[in-house]
A protein has these predicted regions:
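Interdomain hinge/linker segments and adjacent boundary elements that couple functional modules
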Residues: 1-27, 36
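PLD/PLD-like phosphodiesterase catalytic module centered on the HKD motif
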Residues: 22-123
């Protein structure tokens, strides 16, 4: 799922991610290597919402430009990301699983939800 999402990166698209705490706690090294580096190489802009208590992970990502990061007091049990027509949902509990949906309308709706969350989050 992640490889398909990452391979869709295009410098004309923007990656939007509302993250879950457990993703950083369990998979930080994976995310930096297999997600951030290809995004930077392709010069794809990212907006990332991180739980405030995990600000140290946001500070690590500031070097992976272009990126904008905001911090939220709301912590979610799952995360979602949008790029182009692709949307993923990742549930990272005891039995992690993910959904990847390719649909323009669905992606457009999730982008709007992300923007509402973005406006509520702080720098």
């Amino acid at each position: 799922m992640f490889s398909e999402f990452v391979s869709s990166f295009d410098k004309h698209n923007e990656v939007l991610i509302a993250s879950a705490p457990i993703a950083f706690e369990k998979w930080n090294a994976f995310l930096l290597e297999l997600f951030q580096k290809p995004r930077v190489k392709k010069k794809v802009k990212q907006k990332l919402i991180i739980p405030r208590r995990l600000k140290k992970f946001g500070l690590q990502r500031e070097k992976f430009k272009p990126i904008e990061i905001r911090y939220s007091d709301v912590e979610m049990e799952s995360e979602f990301g949008v790029c182009g027509d692709l949307t993923y949902f990742l549930s990272v509990g005891d039995k992690p699983y993910a959904l990847l949906i390719k649909d323009r309308n669905f992606a457009s709706t999730q982008k709007k939800i992300f923007e509402i969350m973005w406006m509520a989050a702080k720098n």
